[in-house]
Curated annotation (Swiss-Prot):
Protein name: DNA-directed RNA polymerase subunit beta
GO MF term (any one): DNA binding
Gene name for this UniProt entry: rpoB
Catalytically driven reaction(s): RNA(n) + a ribonucleoside 5'-triphosphate = RNA(n+1) + diphosphate
Enzyme Commission numbers on file: 2.7.7.6
UniProt cross-references to CDD domains, sorted A to Z: RNA_pol_B_RPB2 (cd00653)
Subunit annotation: The RNAP catalytic core consists of 2 alpha, 1 beta, 1 beta' and 1 omega subunit. When a sigma factor is associated with the core the holoenzyme is formed, which can initiate transcription.
């Protein structure tokens, strides 16, 4: 039974470990299967890289295949790749965190080194010895070996990486997809407002290629944003002649000479809005349209329909037209008119003279087709291919003068060789679809046709055809996930390795070389380490609570390498785009300078293999909404009509309305229901995981919803978790997908359970067969990345039957498998003595007393014992100059005991460091002589607790360097760990043994085996030991064979358990590899209890945040008529201006939920024969219209009582996003609970006992305690560190700094005339070194007088003036006491 309220059929029973099903107001059908794995974005990407469930077409395999084989420069030998193998991690995830090491796996590759037999070697060629039988080169040596190339950080089961013992997350990056993009400057470049069009070809790897118009409509290109050149240079560098260029970009029109002029084909599209200077006549000479008459497209179509196919142009009518090809004198071969030239009156005379009968003209009409390419070509029409290549080379590599072959090779490498240029499959698909090409997807370099088509499309844009691309459209942006990042880093490492191998090959003696000699495993490890440690996208995981973990793994960032920078990103890229619908959450984003650049994946969205985000929709066929779910890309979605999930449908899933609002092409349109193609799968599919947890989200302003989403991630897990009474139904999904809970791997029965372990005997229910034992080790009081406490608690009990993926243990901020970030508290919206002014919060002391918002935080402190030049440091209890009382909580070794209460300046680890010998006074020398040993030869370097920490020691880890003698405490800790390993092994063996011996007894009983001396088998079984059972019944051959088979299976499982145990012990005994010079590391974990106090920040889920201003005694708080004091008072003025009305609706619904629970409690307390019937009747009214109603009807009386008792504290509600209950439904529930349907009640002043004048909104709201705790922010300084140069106290809590007394504060003292106070602030309390020593002496002596010296800042100023060659000297004498400047 899941907490989502699914039905379990007749005889329904609510398990103890299940949450109470919620009263849900959801109307749409939910596709829950898509939500089972919220971190699939991370896991799938990494699995694709390492080759899990992959055909080897990408990832590690493809990198190795691209790199190998590697040949030496002369071709004498070759290093071939055979295969690769990924090993097992040396330590598990928990052990890596504990040891502070990286969770990684070794990668080994099998290499084959082949050396050929050669006859002769020279710099020009190598002559090989050829095998006479095969006619192939003869092999001299062939050596194959498996070689380690380093360790690869492995992703944990939670989608994180453990790097140096710290959990990190690789954030996915949104970047512009490879391909071609067309854009315009939107008229901003020139004051005339003329649109300047441009195109950019972006590869995945390689040089960028830009095309652009200038103000004169000349087309230029740039490579890597260098100096621009005319595009004709690029086309000619590709080998195109002038005629080739004209043929590629312009259509030809053939003019044929006749007696009256030129006969021309009539093309309708050429006459759109044309005004001819001559009469339009047909070939017969009939005038169809008079000269200077404007011919519209309608007229042209009518002429064509009337049969006009050719028309006449007068001889002079071709003036100004562009010739498509050279016009040549037939007799002499001389060129009369060159291709691209315009016809003049002189040319017309020559054409008549040389009897030219047919001319091909370029179809340039200056309206639909412009002469842009032609004009560009004529900038330098005599340029050759070689000239163009050299010109391009000079722009990119200025200052070099290479030969033609080098230039050609360089140009080819820019765009046409896969080693230097890679469009990627995504880029090729985008290029093909954009330009209408049909190039193979595996061709990931540019072709000549690609470049020509890009220029063609750019010219068409200038001619007014088509539209520019929207770079913020999600069809033009893709996601790079963790697998792709690691693959790129892996490729970089392997390329470095390849260069090293080639260098080594040029100098090594092949006769003695082995494959392992060529490979340096540190190369790849260094590249991967740099990425995981220092990349902007490799981030310290937000581990405040389970929601913050999930959100961090689903985050999308536009920042990072290859992405945007926050300073240059404009409004457009940050804004919400229509294609974000169902793909990227429009709500959840940071509030600061990263707003819009960092976002979150929507709930149902997934990323396809090309990196584009897809959103699911239900298919509609003939007005019927089917259950078929299809995922659409942003570029596909615009072509369809997609209805909202809230569209009304009948019982047959047919649309009720004939007309529906749909999304189409980024707009909302009204269409017939027959034309609808798809419908949204759920109203909440547009929001992220965090936003989907906010009930009544639709009633909140978007800015407050954003704050609510972000602040849920800052909620600290509390001492006792409590699920919200008013939720959204997503709580269970988030908890299960976060990894904070423990889910059962297989079906089975709980065999053993305690605070640290759950042991489940897994079995196949159909075959009644034991499949093995699943042992779950729970995380107990572990420290998270943000110092919050991770603690898992079992929710199952002995004998419970669990199914796969059932929640068997809760984690931090989890309540029976549901996310529980805060507490349900009784709230009143009113003012109270001004203490809730400006969002301040008033809290009842009863809340503090009951530890409602108390949280546990775990601090880690580390003590490092080093080997110094004077000798090793030592951990010891007898620390010099420390009294015995301060050492009382240390053990004999000198390490604090677990369970000790420690406070500021308590010693956690006693440690002494050797110091150089000093000259001793006579009395000390006497002691040394008497006792025969040195004294005071070491100094106290113990680990002390910082001044702002107070708590309980809950754990101690001691790591001793391998080879160094272990102390008693480390041996004790090791023995404790071995005991836990023994416990795990014995648990597994006990379960298996019990199952097999039960099966053995069944076998012997069914076979009718007789045992001598016993009348029946039961008496024998009662006395016989387990070992005796195995030797019973062996006289029967059939029974003996079955017993033997069973024994072999039993021994195999037990042997495996012993093997795993020995492996763990061996790893523990292996010791620890510590940094150079470190002998021992001691880590002490202190649990700090944080009670709620003034200054702590609290918030609801609707962006209603505030700071606690006062904790009022419970007896003084306003109370209800029955005397119940409210827990929290919020300012009602904080609601209207913020427009987050969701908190009021939540308060009303929570009030209804609790009062319904109270009414159920009254029915239970009343008892009587009609109690069960009354309960059923009341629950039917509550769950009217819910699926759960039929389950309640099928419950037995006992099950119903259990269910009803769980509802005493309140009936859990679910108000899904965009599907929350309306005010009429809430009023109905309030009436059912027998309270005022307005949701308001009279309150009484707790101090005076008087009733307030009017009713007040009272109810239950879910409040969170955020990690902005006052204990972590406020501090006080008496004496502390000073700055080295200014000698002023440092600032900030981390430096134990003081409060800055700034310029304006000085003005305040001046205004009050407090001269001495001002002098004190500016001198002895700040940077007067001499003065503060004197005032200290005065305090010691009890004297109240003090003298001020010169502040150090004045001396710093003098030094700075001197650095400017201005010598300032301060002079003092009897007559002249002020400063004089020389």
């Amino acid at each position: 039974m899941s907490s989502a309220g699914g039905s379990s059929g007749p005889g329904y029973v609510l398990n103890d470990f299940d949450a109470v099903p919620r009263l849900s107001y959801a109307k749409s059908i939910d596709i829950r299967d898509s939500l089972t794995d919220l971190i699939r974005i991370q896991r799938d990407s990494y699995d694709a890289f390492i080759g899990i469930d992959r055909d080897g077409s990408s990832g590690i395999q493809s990198i190795f295949e691209a790199m190998f084989p590697i040949r030496d420069l002369l071709g004498r030998a070759v290093l071939e790749f055979v295969g690769y193998n990924i090993g097992e991690p040396q330590y598990d995830e928990y052990e890596c965190i504990k040891r502070g090491i990286t969770f990684s796996v070794p990668i080994r590759i099998t290499l084959r080194f082949v050396v050929w037999k050669v006859q002769e070697v020279s710099f020009k060629e190598v002559k090989y010895v050829v095998d006479e039988d095969t006619s192939e080169r003869s092999v001299k040596y062939m050596k194959e070996q498996e070689v380690s190339i380093g360790d690869l950080p492995m992703m944990t089961s939670y989608g994180t990486f453990i790097i140096n013992g710290i959990e990190r997350v690789i954030v996915s990056q949104m970047h512009r997809s490879p391909g071609v993009f067309f854009d315009s400057d939107k008229g901003k470049t020139y004051s005339s407002g003329k649109l300047i069009y441009s195109a950019r070809v972006i590869p995945y790897r390689g040089s960028w290629l830009d095309f652009e118009f200038d103000i004169k409509d000349i087309i230029y290109f740039r490579i890597d944003k260098k100096r621009k050149l005319p595009v004709s240079y690029l086309l000619k560098a590709l080998g195109m002649s002038n005629n080739d260029i004209l043929d590629a970009f312009y259509d030809k029109v053939i003019y044929t000479r006749c007696d009256k002029g030129w006969r021309v084909p009539f093309i309708v599209d050429r006459f759109k809005g044309v005004r001819l200077s001559y009469d339009l006549m047909d070939v017969d000479g009939s005038v169809l349209v008079k000269a200077n008459t404007r011919i519209t497209l309608r007229i042209a179509k009518k002429l064509y329909a009337d049969g006009l196919r050719e028309y006449m142009v007068p001889f002079s009518g071709i003036t100004g037209m562009f010739v498509a090809a050279d016009l040549v004198d037939p007799s002499s071969g001389a060129v009369i008119v060159s291709a691209g030239e315009t016809i003049t009156s002189e040319h017309i005379v020559k054409l008549e003279l040389f009897d030219i009968s047919e001319i091909a003209f370029l179809n340039i009409d200056f309206l639909t087709v412009g002469p842009y390419v032609l004009n560009t070509l004529f900038l330098d029409k005599n340029m050759t291919q070689e000239d163009a290549l050299f010109e391009i080379y000079r722009v990119l590599r200025s200052g070099e003068s290479p030969n033609l072959d080098a230039v050609k090779s360089f140009f080819k490498g820019l765009f046409f060789e896969s080693e230097r240029y890679d469009l990627s499959v995504v880029g090729r698909i985008k290029l093909n679809s954009h330009l209408g090409l049909d190039v193979d997807e595996n061709t990931t370099v540019l072709t000549k046709e690609d470049i020509v088509q890009v220029v063609k499309k750019l010219v068409l844009l200038r001619d007014g055809e088509g539209v520019v691309d929207d770079i913020d459209h999600l069809g033009n942006r893709r996601v790079r996930s963790v697998g792709e990042f690691i693959e790129n880093q892996f490729r970089i490492g392997i390329l470095r390795l390849e260069r090293m191998i080639m260098d080594y090959m040029s100098s090594v003696n092949f006769d003695n070389a082995m494959p392992c000699d060529f490979v340096n495993p540190k190369v790849l490890a260094t590249v991967l380490k740099d990425f995981f440690s220092s990349s902007q996208l490799s981030q310290f995981m937000d581990q405040t609570n389970p929601l913050s973990e999930v959100t961090h793994k689903r985050r999308l960032s536009a920042l990072g390498p290859g992405g945007l920078t926050r300073e240059r990103a404009g409004f457009e890229v940050r804004d919400v785009h229509p294609t974000h619908y169902g793909r990227i959450c429009p709500i959840e984003t940071p509030e600061g300078q990263n707003i819009g650049l960092i976002s979150s994946l929507a709930i149902y969205a997934k990323i396809n293999k090309y990196g584009f985000i897809e959103s699911p929709y239900r298919k509609v066929e003939n007005r019927v909404v089917t259950d078929k779910v299809e995922y659409l890309l942003a570029m596909q979605e615009g072509d369809y009509y997609i209805a909202d999930a809230g569209a009304a449908i009948d019982e047959n899933n047919r649309f009720v309305d004939d007309m529906l609002y749909c999304r189409h092409g980024g707009n909302f349109v009204m269409v017939k229901s027959e034309d609808v193609d798809y419908v949204d799968v759920s109203p909440k599919q547009i929001v992220s995981v965090a936003a989907s947890l906010i009930p009544f989200l639709e009633n909140n302003d978007a800015n407050r919803a954003l704050m609510g989403s972000n602040m849920q991630r800052q909620a600290v897990p509390l001492l006792k978790s409590e699920a919200p009474l008013v939720g959204t139904g997503m709580e269970f999904v988030v908890a299960a997908g976060s990894g904070a809970v423990v889910l059962a791997k297989r079906d089975g029965i709980v065999h053993r359970v305690d605070g640290s372990y759950i042991v489940i005997r897994a079995f196949d229910a159909n075959k009644d067969e034991c499949l093995g034992v699943d042992i779950y080790r729970l995380r107990k009081f572990q420290r998270s990345n943000h110092n919050t406490c991770i603690n898992q608690r079992p929710v199952v009990k002995l004998g419970d039957y669990v199914k796969a993926n059932d929640v068997i243990a809760d984690g931090s901020a989890i309540d029976r498998g549901e996310l529980a970030l805060g507490k349900n508290v009784l709230v009143a919206f009113m003012s109270w003595q001004g203490y809730n002014f400006e969002d301040s919060i008033v809290i009842s002391s009863d809340v503090v007393k009951r530890d409602v918002f108390t949280s546990i935080h775990i601090e880690e402190f580390e003590c490092v014992v080093r080997d110094t030049p004077l000798g090793p440091e030592k951990i010891m209890r007898s620390v010099p100059d420390v009294n015995e009382e301060s050492l009382s909580h240390l053990d004999d070794v000198g390490i604090v005991n677990i369970g000790a209460e420690v406070s500021a300046s308590s010693i956690l680890v006693g440690k002494v460091t050797p110091r150089p010998p000093v000259s001793l006074p006579p009395e000390t020398k006497l002691l040394v002589t008497i006792f025969g040993e040195k004294v005071f030869d070491c100094v106290d370097s113990s680990l002390y607790l910082p001044p702002d920490v107070e708590g309980t020691v809950i754990d101690v880890h001691v790591f001793v360097r391998r080879g160094v003698e272990e102390n008693d405490r480390s041996l004790l800790i090791k023995q404790s760990e071995i005991s836990s390993f023994v416990k795990e092994r014995d648990y597994e063996i006990d379960v298996v043994s019990e199952y097999f011996h039960d099966e053995l007894r069944k076998l012997l009983r069914n076979a009718g085996v007789k045992v001598k001396g016993y009348s029946d088998l039961d008496s024998f079984f009662a006395e016989a030991s387990d070992d005796t059972l195995w030797s019973t019944g062996l006289a029967d051959a059939k029974v003996a064979a079955k017993v033997k088979d069973m024994r072999e299976r039993f021994d195999s499982i037990v042997g495996e358990a012993h093997r795993k145990f020995e492996q763990k012990v061996d790893k523990l005994n292996y010791g620890y590899d510590l940094p150079q010079g470190v002998l021992t590391i001691v880590k002490v974990f202190v649990a700090v209890k944080h009670n709620l106090q003034p200054g702590d920040k609290m918030a609801g889920r609707h962006g209603n945040k505030g700071v606690i201003s006062r904790i009022v005694p419970a007896e003084d708080m306003p109370h209800l008529e029955d005397g119940t004091p409210v827990d929290i008072i919020l300012n009602s003025l904080g609601v209207p201006s913020r427009m987050n009305i969701g908190q009021i609706l939540e308060t009303h619904l929570g009030w209804a939920a609790v009062n319904l629970g109270k009414k159920i409690g009254r029915i239970l307390d009343k008892g009587g024969p009609s109690m069960i019937a009354d309960l059923r009747d009341f629950l039917d009214k509550i769950y009217d219209g819910q699926k759960l109603k039929s389950d309640i009807a099928s419950m037995s009386s006992e099950a119903l009582l259990v269910f009803a008792n769980r509802l005493r504290k309140g009936v859990p509600m679910a108000a899904p996003v965009f599907e929350g209950p309306k005010d009429a439904q809430i009023s109905k529930l309030l009436e059912l609970a027998e309270v005022d349907p307005s949701g308001q009640v009279y309150l009484y002043d707790g101090r005076l006992g008087k009733k307030f004048d009017r009713k007040i909104t009272v109810g239950y709201i879910y409040m969170l305690k955020l990690h902005h705790l006052v204990d972590d922010k406020i501090h006080a300084r008496s004496v502390g560190p000073y700055g080295l140069v200014t000698q002023q106290p440092l600032g900030g809590k981390s430096h134990f700094g003081g409060q800055r007394f700034g310029e304006m504060e000085c003005w305040a003292l001046q205004a009050y005339g407090a001269a001495y106070t001002l002098q004190e602030m500016l001198t002895v309390k700040s940077d007067d070194i001499v003065g503060r020593v004197k005032i200290y002496e005065s305090i010691i002596k009890g004297d109240s007088n003090f003298e001020c010296g010169i502040p150090e800042s004045f001396n710093v100023m003098i030094k700075e003036l001197r650095s400017l060659c201005l010598n300032v000297v301060l002079k003092q004498d009897k007559e002249f006491t002020s400063g004089e400047v020389e």
